[in-house]
Amino acid sequence: MFSEYKSTKKAGPKPAQKVEQVYEYAVWWLNQRGYSVSKLKEKLTRKTDNPEWIASVIEKLLDQGYLSDQRFAETFVQSRCRLYGPKVLTQKLKLQGVGTTDIEHALCTINDSDTDELISRVIAKYSGKKSIRDITMRLKSEGIDDTRIQSVLSSNIDTEHESQLATRIINKHAKKMGRSGLLQKLRSEGISQDTIDELFSEESKDDVIEDDQHKALEQLNKKYKTSLTDFAEKKKATAFLVRKGFSFSEANYAIEHHLEDL
């Protein structure tokens, strides 16, 4: 009997018998941390299903200054503005049920030093891993002003940042990809043309062609273990190499010398 009683007992706080108990319950939660009006109402529905009591308690707390969406929004923003940009903060506050006017007022309390710290944190996180373009897009998605982004970027990132990222990309893909594919990959990752030109400035054109021809041949030999005898097979082989980032001339060289030294 006892076990059956335990399993059916309603979880949550003891239901309020009078409005004063709802008020005390609300004050207890506000002493734990700040709440928006909307979220505190949700808490109070656990104590009572009487909407008039809830409305009365909320009104009393607002009149006493214990409850304020404006103050909640300001505190929320100040505690998180070095972690999130305005767009994300706005989304989070809307989920708390805070209105647009209070959100806009709270966002106005963010100063430039807070924003600069957020930008610097994102730069440090992605330095050498993401291009300047991608970092800029990431910050813009947070709702940070482009002028502020560029100001901090110019003092925190130099060409060495892109060179490190480009070198990582090259080292990862160079053995399996031709020069045209590498260039396309670098550009798609937001690496500037100046950085690309600098990295490849000391290579001779003939050496590049020869190296890419041999890489294309190596990839083809791994993929196709038997001779390519008809046009359809050669067409598929060419498409395979082009997808790998090799040019048509490099693909033709590989097909011509396929399995030659094996």
Curated annotation (Swiss-Prot):
GO terms for biological process: regulation of DNA repair. The keyword DNA-binding does not apply. Keywords: Cytoplasm. Its main location: cytoplasm. It comes from the Bacteria. Signal peptide: none annotated. One of its GO terms (cellular component) is cytoplasm. The keyword DNA-binding does not apply. It is found in: Cytoplasm. Belongs to the RecX family. Modulates RecA activity. HAMAP family: RecX. This is Regulatory protein RecX. It comes from Photobacterium profundum (strain SS9). The lineage of its organism: Bacteria, Pseudomonadati, Pseudomonadota, Gammaproteobacteria, Vibrionales. The gene is recX.
